[in-house]
Amino acid sequence: KLVDTANFDDYMKALGVGFATRQMAGLTKEISFKLDEEFDETTADDRHVKKLILTLTMGNVVSTRTYPTTI
């Protein structure tokens, strides 16, 4: 569980992480979900989508987003 992000930007900068990626990292938030159950998500650009998170073998995780269709 994330407790503190003090100096995280400086840390990423020291690792050579680019500006845009560092800015996106600052937008991360904790989520709670159950595997194989779809849930609502709001993307970083404020779109509302359905998301499904599936697991694969060897600890790899795959997620899919379903964007609403407009007519």
UniProtKB/Swiss-Prot annotation:
GO cellular component, one term: cytosol
Family: Belongs to the calycin superfamily. Fatty-acid binding protein (FABP) family.
Gene Ontology MF annotations: long-chain fatty acid binding
Keywords carried by this UniProt record: Lipid-binding, Transport
GO terms under biological process: long-chain fatty acid transport
Gene: FABP
Database matches in SUPFAM superfamilies: Lipocalins
Name used for this protein in its record: Fatty acid-binding protein, smooth muscle
InterPro entries, per database record: Calycin, ILBP
Cystines in this chain: none
Post-translational modification note: The N-terminus is blocked.
Top-level taxonomic group: Eukaryota
Function noted in UniProt: May be involved in the regulation of smooth muscle contraction by transporting polyunsaturated fatty acids (e.g. arachidonic acid).
Keyword Lipid biosynthesis included in the entry's annotation: no
PANTHER family tied to this protein: FATTY ACID BINDING PROTEIN
